[in-house]
């Protein structure tokens, strides 16, 4: 069966779509497969390397640079080791390699960079390539790696027309490897025969087997000789043909072991006839193994040539790209089975599919492939063509040159060169016998010269374009009327400025406008005058409104400033009032203590008739939290911790020092009204009237206290969930309840004497006095605290100040906003117990500052005692600032060392707080208002607003000059 198909009129030229592989048009109801920008038959859509049928829905397909599909198995399989590639792959052409498998064929050295050489599909490093194939002269390269191909060219006659031109039709016969004979053994002889008459193949139509019998075997028009003139072609790339059994045996080239395949692998390819036109497929990257040219006779035409091409032969030029079935040139050089007088191929289907080789440079190769455009070979042209198109079709590895011997046909040498960079142009010449002959190849022109010539042509074109562009710019510059002489000195700014002004004057020139006759028209002038009058009216009306709005805005700004001042004053007043409230509370406590201690011992008998004992049995010690039966028969309970569900019943014998506690359930009626025995007293503090002093069985229960009240034991404010007596409604802290039953504390709460000279005092209710100074940290003098701790600063001051320095300098309202009372009590207890941690202080900065102020407030002697305080008030009368600073320093140096160290530490810390007043809003005035009452006290502990203002002023002066004071201290 002869695989010859004429596509002189390509289906694409008729407007139909053809398959990218077989070149055949699609049937009417056939659905093509679109992939890689091309259309495919379902049967033709196969892997380029392994020829395995593919599904278009497969998402793992890989597309080559020319749009051919490759299955995932071939794309991810190493060509060298045949193992699957799981990570990155190095691509060279259509071959994939592991990183460690990408090695030189000779030295087995791993190739890391992209500089390597490639011969066919064999990889060489640069060193091995130079050693293996050193550069040769032009004379040596002419005789190096050649084989003979019988070529005879004659013009053919076709139908003439007005636009007809002479063209040349060349038939290229590709020898392929037929299947082995049944008896085994391969025949390496290549015999090429062509029919003697091709007149019946008009339009490229190939006769069938029946038509072959009508062909004359020895016609005068035969292009190829008969059997006696058969020529043999050696397809070796590196060796010359050698004789074997009276014939030439093609010696296999030195190929990679990966390219060696079994002789059983067969490959077949159809023949093809190519038109030599200017638009014909010009691909310099395909390789031909043998070319034979056959004229096509057409008796109906004598003026023009009709180009024909066998498209199916195009797919066979590059051989197979399968990594598993790689064919060498020698393996393909098998004899062709003769069918009559026409060369025919076996009917077996080729298991291989052609591929488009990658673009390769003669110097370096890159693993990234790039294939040229191979779509133009399907186009036909009726324009005159020459052999230069066919010369471009013959890739650089195979250059045709005429054989010096003569004969009925021309024999050419086919030189297979390793370099793939040169491309020879062949121009046909018409001989005396009417035959076309290829010109002799000039061995003096090397591939490098051809490349240089092409580069020179490109550079000439670029030079012409640049010359034209320069000329165009020169014309534009000469046509410009702008005077650029002023810009000769670019550094002269005055010149540039004057040039700009000149341009603006020219641009805004109204000389031509004034000469316009339209402006002199009376109607136009009236319209302009009316428009100007209207604009003036608008300016006047809107100007008045704008002025009113501006005045309103200024008034609002003034109001805003006034509100800001009032707000600042209110903040200062609130801080001052809070300080005054603390001072008033201290003054109230002091007054109560003074009144209670003024009762003389000799008048103790006068007080006995008002105080009666609640029990005749006295004991020297008191057992707190003892379950005793109540005389009233309410309830009794076991001793245990105080809880909201239990009431604590306490009987107190003030004189007999006896007390008892009863636990009662909460179902006791708590709606007994609180009755104050002093009707004029506005205080909510619990009092004990003269009538009820005889006996009170205190029954404490947990109650929510929201009205201002004082603790019965410590006289401090009570708020929130605390204890309240069910009978007399006195309040008590839960922490102070244990002091009620301590004997030492019980003795301190009893008054033994009453002053004789107290008749002039107003009648006040009698209350239990608060306990004396606590022997704990809060309430201990600085001298004793430093001796106990053995440090320069008390622990409370050091930790609180460090916490504020680290986290609170930019907190708004620091030291002004008080912390939660419950959190403050928790922190105070932790300081007392020694379990305080810095993390506890940083969790609530306001509670931390409140603890510091509480510690300073409870000091028996303030940081600045009364003596130094009086001297500071005298220093405030000094007008000169320097003298005042010196006086303040002198007064501070008279402090006790413990007080002086605390003062230096605190005044430096408060100075740092004032420096961040923009963010924390605590300037020197606000800070002095908060800390002056706690740092300074007079001797008599008097309270008035005048002294409070003097304290704040003195401390503010020290804060404003803190650096100078600390430098001199």
Swiss-Prot record:
Domain LIM zinc-binding: 17-81, 76-135
SUPFAM superfamilies: Cysteine-rich domain (SSF57889), GTPase activation domain, GAP (SSF48350)
Short name of one Pfam family: LIM
Domain of life per record: Eukaryota
Keyword check for Zinc: yes
Swiss-Prot/TrEMBL keywords: GTPase activation, LIM domain, Metal-binding, Repeat, Zinc, Zinc-finger
Main location: other
Gene Ontology biological-process entries: small GTPase-mediated signal transduction
Positions marked as site (Arginine finger): 816
Signal sequence range: none
PANTHER family (alphabetical): CHIMERIN FAMILY MEMBER (PTHR46075), RHO GTPASE ACTIVATING PROTEIN AT 5A, ISOFORM A (PTHR46075:SF2)
Function summary: GTPase-activating protein for Rho-type proteins.
Protein name, as recorded: Probable Rho-type GTPase-activating protein 3
Organism: Schizosaccharomyces pombe (strain 972 / ATCC 24843) (Fission yeast)
Gene designation: rga3
């Amino acid at each position: 069966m002869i695989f010859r198909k004429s596509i002189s009129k390509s289906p694409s030229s008729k407007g139909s779509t053809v398959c990218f592989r077989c070149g055949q048009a699609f049937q009417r109801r056939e659905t093509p497969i679109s992939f890689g920008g091309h259309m495919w038959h379902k049967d033709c859509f196969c892997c380029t390397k392994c020829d395995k049928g593919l599904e278009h829905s497969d998402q793992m397909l890989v597309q080559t640079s020319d749009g051919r599909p490759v299955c995932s198995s071939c794309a991810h399989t190493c060509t060298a080791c045949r193992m699957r590639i799981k990570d990155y792959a190095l691509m060279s052409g259509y071959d994939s390699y592991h990183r460690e498998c990408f090695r030189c064929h000779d030295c087995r050295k791993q190739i890391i960079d992209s500089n390597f050489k490639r011969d066919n599909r064999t990889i060489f490093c640069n060193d091995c390539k130079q050693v293996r194939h050193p550069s040769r002269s032009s004379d040596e390269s002419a005789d190096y790696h050649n084989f003979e191909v019988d070529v005879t060219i004659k013009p053919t006659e076709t139908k003439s027309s007005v636009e007809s031109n002479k063209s040349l039709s060349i038939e290229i016969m590709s020898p392929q490897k037929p299947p082995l004979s049944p008896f085994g053994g391969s025949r390496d002889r290549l015999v090429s025969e062509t029919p003697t008459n091709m007149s019946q193949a008009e339009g490229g139509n190939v006769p069938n087997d029946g038509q072959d019998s009508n062909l004359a075997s020895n016609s005068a028009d035969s292009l190829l000789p008969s059997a006696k003139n058969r020529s043999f072609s050696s397809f070796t790339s590196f060796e010359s043909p050698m004789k074997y059994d009276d014939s030439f045996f093609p010696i296999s080239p030195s190929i990679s072991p990966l390219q060696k395949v079994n002789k059983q692998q067969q490959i077949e390819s159809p023949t093809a006839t190519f038109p030599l036109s200017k638009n014909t497929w010009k691909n310099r990257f395909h390789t031909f193994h043998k070319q034979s040219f056959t004229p096509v006779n057409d008796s109906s035409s004598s003026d023009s040539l009709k180009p024909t091409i066998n498209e199916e032969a195009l797919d066979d030029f590059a051989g197979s790209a399968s990594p598993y079935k790689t064919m060498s040139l020698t393996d393909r050089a098998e004899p062709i089975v003769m069918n009559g007088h026409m060369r025919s191929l076996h009917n077996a289907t080729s298991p291989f599919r052609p591929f488009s080789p990658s673009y390769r440079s003669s110097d370096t190769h890159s693993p990234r492939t790039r294939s040229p455009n191979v779509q133009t070979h399907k186009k036909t042209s009726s324009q005159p063509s020459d052999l230069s198109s066919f010369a471009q079709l013959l890739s650089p590895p195979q250059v045709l040159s005429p054989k010096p011997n003569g004969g009925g046909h021309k024999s050419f040498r086919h030189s297979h060169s390793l370099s793939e960079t040169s491309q020879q142009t062949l121009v046909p010449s018409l001989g005396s016998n009417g035959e076309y002959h290829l010109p002799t190849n000039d061995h003096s022109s090397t591939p490098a010269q051809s490349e240089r010539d092409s580069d020179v042509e490109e550079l000439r074109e670029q030079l012409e374009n640049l010359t034209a562009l320069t000329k165009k710019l020169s014309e534009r510059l000469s046509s410009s009327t702008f005077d650029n002489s002023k810009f000769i000195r670019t550094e002269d700014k005055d010149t540039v400025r004057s040039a700009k002004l000149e341009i603006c004057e020219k641009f805004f020139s109204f000389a031509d406008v004034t000469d316009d006759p339209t402006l002199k028209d009376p109607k136009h002038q009236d319209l302009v005058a009316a428009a100007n009058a209207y604009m003036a009216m608008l300016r006047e009306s809107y100007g008045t409104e704008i002025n009113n709005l501006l005045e309103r805005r200024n008034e609002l700004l003034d109001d805003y400033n006034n509100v800001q001042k009032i707000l600042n004053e209110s903040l200062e007043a609130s801080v001052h009032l809070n300080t005054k409230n603390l001072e008033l509370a201290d003054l109230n406590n002091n007054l109560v203590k003074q009144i209670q201690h003024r009762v003389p011992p000799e008048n103790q008998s006068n007080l006995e008739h008002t105080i009666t004992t609640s029990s005749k049995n006295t004991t020297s010690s008191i057992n707190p939290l003892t379950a005793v039966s109540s005389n009233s028969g309410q309830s009794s309970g076991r001793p245990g911790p105080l809880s909201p569900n239990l009431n604590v019943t306490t009987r107190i014998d003030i004189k007999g020092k006896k007390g008892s506690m009863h636990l009662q359930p909460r179902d006791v009626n708590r709606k007994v009204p609180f009755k104050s025995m002093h009707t004029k007293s506005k205080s909510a503090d619990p009092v004990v009237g003269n009538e009820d002093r005889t006996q009170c069985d205190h029954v404490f229960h947990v109650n929510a206290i929201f009205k201002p009240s004082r603790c019965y034991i410590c006289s401090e404010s009570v708020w929130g969930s605390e204890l309240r007596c069910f009978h007399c409604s006195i309040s008590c802290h839960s922490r102070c309840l244990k002091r009620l039953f301590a004997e030492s504390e019980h003795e301190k709460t009893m008054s033994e004497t009453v002053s004789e000279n107290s008749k002039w005092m107003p009648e006040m209710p009698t209350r239990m006095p608060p306990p004396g100074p606590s022997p704990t940290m809060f309430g201990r003098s600085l001298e004793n605290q430093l001796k106990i701790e053995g440090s320069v600063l008390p622990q409370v001051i050091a930790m609180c100040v460090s916490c504020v320095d680290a986290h609170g300098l930019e907190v708004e309202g620091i030291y002004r906003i008080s912390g939660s009372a419950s959190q403050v009590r928790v922190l105070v207890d932790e300081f007392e117990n020694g379990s305080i941690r810095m993390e506890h202080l940083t969790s609530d900065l306001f509670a931390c500052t409140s603890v510091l102020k509480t510690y300073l407030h409870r000091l028996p002697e303030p940081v600045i005692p009364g003596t130094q305080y009086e001297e500071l008030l005298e220093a405030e009368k000094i007008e000169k600032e320097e003298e005042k600073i010196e006086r303040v320093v002198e007064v501070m140096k008279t402090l006790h060392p413990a007080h002086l160290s605390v003062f230096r530490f605190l005044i430096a810390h408060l100075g740092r707080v004032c420096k961040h007043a923009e963010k924390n809003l605590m300037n020197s005035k606000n800070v002095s208002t908060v800390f002056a009452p706690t740092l300074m006290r007079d001797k008599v502990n008097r309270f008035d607003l005048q002294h409070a203002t003097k304290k704040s002023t003195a401390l503010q002066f020290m804060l404003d000059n803190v650096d100078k004071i600390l430098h001199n201290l």
